[in-house]
Swiss-Prot record:
This is Peptidase B. Homohexamer. The gene is pepB. Its EC number is 3.4.11.23. The active site is at residues 208, 282. One of its GO terms (cellular component) is cytoplasm. It comes from Yersinia pseudotuberculosis serotype IB (strain PB1/+). The keyword Coiled coil does not apply. Probably plays an important role in intracellular peptide degradation. Binds 2 manganese ions per subunit. Gene3D superfamilies: Zn peptidases.
């Protein structure tokens, strides 16, 4: 690996034919040139950064014209990797763009590092504490919080989080964090964010195969994404009150673990029969959504690495969006477009809510065998725990959170996608 700083420049001219047809990068005695086309320039920069990193170049300087905020960020998205050290000398930016870049580097890199962390190093309580630390680093005066842990969850009737997490030696945790920059303890809550924080998912007694378990340190991606989104919105100047609920647990196999056929009784009166212990994310989110509904906020967003079905539909490039509220769903898609992130809305209809039949409880935690729309029925399950589910509620199935292997735009591991979109939406809603 070279220790010299390599200059990286942008060009709208094609590379010399010696570099091959439509070559993305070329080199000369001045450094590396990225050759942009009129189509998907940010994606081209990100792919070029992956190529540069793959050549062992770890210290670079962004030189010449064209390096604005989004170009610089696209380079970092591709250049960054989960191991080894990299450094970038950034091009000069206007003060506001420099500040935004620094905020993204602090917050979205935190999200990626947190999702990439080994499960042994990041249990439920540590995830909650790390989330508090991030938000305190951004706006500590506006932050207060409560951690409910272990047997206290059972006593306070957080039945989903407690049931899922009781099989682990590491106690389950609910973090309820209040971001209130108004200084008024009676200020209305503009939004509630509810994140799935399963710090390792073995599948429980519905045990995963190794090929599906090896990435399950990342099953807390929804919690990390929403924590980062609130932090970025706060850094960008959010002045409205937002509550964050992180539903954190390990899903393990033990003599104390929950079993197929068990019935969970929730605080809102719903009963749920367990027919698959690997459909645990929705069980912990239900507790957070009940709390969120009690705040009477006009906006509730939950995010979770919830289903393989969403990845089957969209791959790892798009996050899946579900909502009964067309106007709100479009607002999030508009925010995603503004932030150069990819979301795709998938179906969620009233009839999906009846596709979770149980012989012994009001709901089953998985859809009946005749109903194969797994991502839609998972979203429908969650809707039973949102008081006003038809308006003001968004569910994000985080299919783009993590990649098991590198591709042309991304290294292996966490992407940080979704943080900017949710932050943008929070700020847009605050202006209404």
């Amino acid at each position: 690996m070279t220790t010299e700083i390599m200059q990286i420049s942008l060009s709208h001219n094609p590379a010399d034919a010696r570099w091959g047809e439509k070559a993305l990068i070329s080199t000369n005695d001045q450094g590396v040139t990225i050759h942009l086309t009129s189509h998907d320039q940010l994606g081209g920069i990100q792919r070029a950064a992956r190529k540069i990193d793959g050549q062992g170049i770890k210290q670079v300087k962004l030189a010449g014209e064209g390096w604005g905020l989004e170009q610089s960020w696209a380079f970092w998205q591709g250049f960054r990797g989960p191991k080894g050290q990299r450094s970038v000398v950034w091009a000069e930016l206007p003060a506001n763009e420099k500040t935004e870049l620094e905020q993204r580097l602090q917050i979205i890199d935190w999200v990626r590092d947190t999702i990439n962390a080994p499960a042994e190093d990041l249990g439920p309580e540590q995830l909650a504490k790390n989330a508090i630390d991030l938000l305190c680093a951004v706006s500590c005066d506006a932050v207060s919080y409560r951690i409910t842990k272990g047997e206290d969850l059972r006593e306070q009737n957080y039945a989903g989080i407690y049931t899922v997490g009781r099989g682990s030696d590491r106690a389950p945790v609910l973090l309820a964090l209040d971001y209130n920059p108004t200084g008024n303890p009676d200020a209305p809550v503009m939004a509630c964010l509810v994140g799935k924080g399963i710090t390792f998912d073995s599948g429980g007694y519905s045990l995963k195969q190794s090929a599906f378990m090896d990435s399950m340190k990342s099953d807390m991606g929804g919690a990390a994404t929403l924590t980062g989104a609130l932090a970025l919105a706060a850094a960008r100047g959010l002045k409205e009150r937002v509550k964050l609920y992180l539903c954190c647990a390990d899903n393990m196999v033990s003599g104390n673990a929950f079993k197929l056929g068990d019935i969970i009784r929730y605080r809102n009166g719903k009963t749920v029969e367990i027919m698959n212990t690997d459909a645990e994310g929705r069980l912990v989110l239900a507790d957070g959504l009940i709390d969120a509904s009690e705040q009477n906020a006009p906006l509730i967003i939950d995010a979770a690495t919830l289903t393989g079905a969403a990845k089957t539909a969209l791959g790892n490039d798009y996050h899946a969006l579900f909502s009964f509220d067309d106007e709100l769903a479009q607002a999030l898609l508009n925010s995603a477009h503004s932030e150069h992130e990819l979301f795709w809305r998938l179906p969620l209809a009233e009839f999906h809510r009846s596709q979770l039949p149980s012989n012994f409880a009001e709901l089953n935690n998985v859809a009946g065998g005749a109903y194969s729309a797994g991502a839609s029925t998972a979203a429908a399950f969650l809707s039973h725990f949102v008081k006003n589910y038809q308006q003001g509620w968004l569910h994000i199935d985080c299919s783009a959170t993590y990649r098991k292997s590198a591709v042309d735009q991304w290294s292996a591991g966490a992407t940080g996608l979704g943080v900017r979109t949710v932050a943008n939406l929070l700020l847009a809603q605050a202006k209404q």
